[in-house]
Amino acid sequence: MTEISPTPAARDNVTSSTFPDVELLRIDHVGVAVPDLDAAIQFYAETFGLRCVHQETNEEQGVREAMLGVGDGTGTKIQLLAPARPDSAIAKFLDRSGPGLQQLAYTVADVEAAAAALRARGLRLLYDTPKRGTGGSRINFVHPKDAGGVLVELVEPATAV
């Protein structure tokens, strides 16, 4: 079993009240890496009845992505991620790990404040400043080595939550 082990700064004997709150609002989505986006959308639709509520290509990250929802599509989503180019993070993930769960994402009101709160706890984030995510959102990621092996994404929606 993987032990959740933050950096040494996060292990100091301090209480959580010493740090600013991260203020997670909800589970936003679970990301699944797939080699073929269209085939994966069809599989999730035919097998589980999920419907595609958003689809785009993020050139900056080199990924084709689709958000799949249940019912009216307003709850937690499944995000399918397929490489748009061979040097993308998703292509490297697929080469290393094969298809499957790639990330867990939380909605936050302010991605920079959440990142600062996590850094204050000694956790590393992948980006110094937020990047553009799905639908114009702003995102950052907690390094998986600081989150029990899970790539945690922080998502600030493009519109007010």
Give the positions of each predicted feature.
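An N-terminus-focused feature that recognizes amino-terminal "leader" regions
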Residues: 47, 62-65
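Short, conserved turn/kink motifs that form compact alpha/beta structural patches or helix kinks used as
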Residues: 81-83
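Amphipathic alpha-helical segments
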Residues: 36-51, 119-121
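Vicinal oxygen chelate
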Residues: 2-22, 27-35, 66-72, 76-78, 90-117, ...
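Short loop/beta submotifs within extracellular cysteine-rich repeat domains
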Residues: 51, 74-77, 88-89, 149-150
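A cross-kingdom feature marking solvent-exposed beta-strand/loop segments within repeated
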Residues: 17-22, 26-28, 52-53, 60-62, ...
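Extended macromolecule-engaging scaffold surfaces
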Residues: 2, 50-53
